[in-house]
């Protein structure tokens, strides 16, 4: 989402933006113009010959891509239409869970951004949802239904109802980290977060939740508009997507989980001005490279914050990998209501397998 000046740029102007003379190295004259390489080492996982495939279209606001190994399917949400959908090779796209994030559990603005946003799996294979309209994090059995029964995991901090949980990840030691900006109170005419009698927390928080004892602690409230979250491979750092909705300066931040110190890993002001779009979802590849939405597509940086590549999917909300990182899956945006995938180079040796953190 975005302040009017920047979000209208991302929604209305993006389709007219041309590839600019940004200081990157073009490795070949015949590879797809959808891929821009800034550092050749990224070619270990990016295939310049890969084509971008459209898996789904006419999804009002796609988000929350999550690979379901059990069904060999991609799950994703449509925030505006309040549903979870499923895609696989055999059946294509189908409705999966409805309603997904606005069931009447909590008072909300009643505006469009009230469906479920991020998805994840708990240790038992149940589906975890960030429910923007219900203003909670909940779980449900991972199966198709149009009469869902959700179990609340957390819906308040110190007795005050959450804003509208947005993204959720799970650490290797079982803790849940989630962001809670107030996008459930976004006025879609002005693209501003509005005051509401229903809003009880006056900051945009990032929280740590212990599913065993239900303890909830505040990690930080110092990020003006936190969105996507991811953990570094060593689990020592929390990567935070700070949107540019208030200051037109989207960033990838790096929070030390021990000291809580926050540093800027990547400043996205320049590339957002160049290509449009804001910062949203984020995932970490097993190589340590960080994939995230921004700059009119998906940007890739290394763990030091160096820009490695840009893939022009159009304006995007989020991305995900399948089990073996064979494909990159991308969810579009309001002006780009599609779900895509692109084949990656495998970083695995024959006979080797990895476990992908589904955050």
Language-model features: where?
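Bacterial Sec-dependent N-terminal signal peptides
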Residues: 1-29
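Sequence-structural signature of mature extracellular/luminal beta-sheet repeat domains
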Residues: 24-359
């Amino acid at each position: 989402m975005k302040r009017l000046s920047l979000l209208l740029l991302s929604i209305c102007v993006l389709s007219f933006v041309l590839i600019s003379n940004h200081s990157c190295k073009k490795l070949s004259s015949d590879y797809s113009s959808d891929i821009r390489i800034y550092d050749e080492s990224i070619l270990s996982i990016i295939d310049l010959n890969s084509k971008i495939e459209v898996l789904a279209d006419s999804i009002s606001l796609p988000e929350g891509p999550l690979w379901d190994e059990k069904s060999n399917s991609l799950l994703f949400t449509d925030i505006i239409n309040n549903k979870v959908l499923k895609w696989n090779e055999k059946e294509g796209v189908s409705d999966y869970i409805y309603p997904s994030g606005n069931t009447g559990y909590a008072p909300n603005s009643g505006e469009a951004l009230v469906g479920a946003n991020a998805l994840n799996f708990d240790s038992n294979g149940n589906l975890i949802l960030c429910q923007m309209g219900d203003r909670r994090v909940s779980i449900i059995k991972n199966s198709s239904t149009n009469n869902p029964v959700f179990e609340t995991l957390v819906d308040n901090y110190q007795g005050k109802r959450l804003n509208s949980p947005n993204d959720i990840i799970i650490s290797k030691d079982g803790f849940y980290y989630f962001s809670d900006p107030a996008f459930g109170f976004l006025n879609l005419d002005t693209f501003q977060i509005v005051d509401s009698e229903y809003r009880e927390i006056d900051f945009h928080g990032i929280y740590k939740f212990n599913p065993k004892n239900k303890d909830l602690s505040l990690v930080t409230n110092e990020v003006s508009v936190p969105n996507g979250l991811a953990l570094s491979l060593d689990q020592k750092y929390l990567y935070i997507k700070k949107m540019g909705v208030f200051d037109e300066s989207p960033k990838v931040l790096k929070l030390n989980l021990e000291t809580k110190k926050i540093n800027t890993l990547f400043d996205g002001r320049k590339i957002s001005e160049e290509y449009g779009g804001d910062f949203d979802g984020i995932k970490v590849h097993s190589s340590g490279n960080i994939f995230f939405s921004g700059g009119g597509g998906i940007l890739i940086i290394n763990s030091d914050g160096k820009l490695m590549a840009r893939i022009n999917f159009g304006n995007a909300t989020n991305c995900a990998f399948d089990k073996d990182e064979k494909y990159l899956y991308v969810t579009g945006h309001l002006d780009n209501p599609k779900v895509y995938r692109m084949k990656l180079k495998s970083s695995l040796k024959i006979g080797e397998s990895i476990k992908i953190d589904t955050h």
